[in-house]
Amino acid sequence: METTVNSKIANQVSASRQPRFSGMSHVSLPCRDLEESKIFYAHVMGGELIHEIRGFVEFRIEDIIIGLSEQPEGWTGPDDEYPHYAFYISGVNLELMKNWLDRYAVPNYPYRRGDTALIYFRDPSGNLFELYCDTGYEGIKALPLAPRRGGPPIDFRALNYRWDSKAAVQDIGKSILRPRFTAFAHASIFCRNLEQAKRFFTRVIGGELIHDVDGFAEVKVAGIIIGFTERPGQPTGQNAEYPHYAFFVEPEDFLPMVAWLRQNGVTTSEAWTRDGIKGLLYFRDPTGNLFEMYCPKLKDAQSFARGAKQGGSYTIDFAGLNYQWNG
């Protein structure tokens, strides 16, 4: 069956049209303790639990889905800035969120970059988040400058903590004014070679380069901003599934995108499915950051290999997805 699927994929690349992703489906993160994380993401982050199976949950937070699964490691390094995940937030809600984090003993660092107010904090596992407020925060002048704007260095290690969820549990069900995020802003990831990453994300992934300065670049892909830098950080572990970043792809673009990636020197998993309806595929960028393609309803998925956890025989070799890219 896989041979038939691969033969079909090989004939999918069009000379006139590059396949495209259609949006961001989800960001799935590793966690140390799933039950603790469920409390944090529901009560502190304001997420709505939308999916739960053994060992894995998903929360909807505004316009993004955050998945969580226990893993021995893989969260942002204790001294690192990358990867991190950012939400837009209004000025009023930024002040509320600062107080909210303090209320639940979550260390945080507010600062400013130009006219933008920001706050860094971590979840209990160590995944790093950023709040991004580019208008309406009245206290911005009192915030320290960003390090690259003349301010003090950020102590990312000090943002790590052992969380006591007792206060959050006690507040469940209470009528409290809660902060709200506006939308998902960006995912910023580590890369080993910035120039190579720019080529990969524009030429292969189809992103538009929208920011390129001081060792950091951003592309817009399917309406989502992805930043990358050589500053201290780490990609997805060689044998790990988390973190990974998933793009929606339309049915007509699924097989062409698989063929496009392979034609451009990207090692991919097999096209696979959990249920014969959804089409799935994993691949990495040249640094090793793990990405997923996700099509919710794909006719061709009937012929795809079924995952081992869903009663099939297909197991993803995550280490085998690492490769040397020559693009």
Model-assigned labels for residue ranges:
Residues 2-65, 73, 185:
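Hydrophobic, helix-prone linear segments
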Residues 25-34, 68-69, 185-195, 228-232, ...:
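Short N-terminal helix-initiation segments at or just after the protein's N-terminus
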Residues 18-21, 49-50, 66-69, 154-161, ...:
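Feature detects tandemly repeated or modular, low-complexity segments in exposed regions of proteins
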Residues 9, 37, 47, 57-61, ...:
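Low-complexity, intrinsically disordered tandem-repeat tracts enriched in small residues
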Residues 2-18, 24-32, 60, 76-100, 103-180, 258, ...:
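Vicinal oxygen chelate
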Residues 48-81, 91, 128-135, 208-241, ...:
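Conserved short beta-strand elements that form part of the metal-binding/catalytic scaffold
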Residues 33-48, 97-104, 193-208:
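Amphipathic alpha-helical segments
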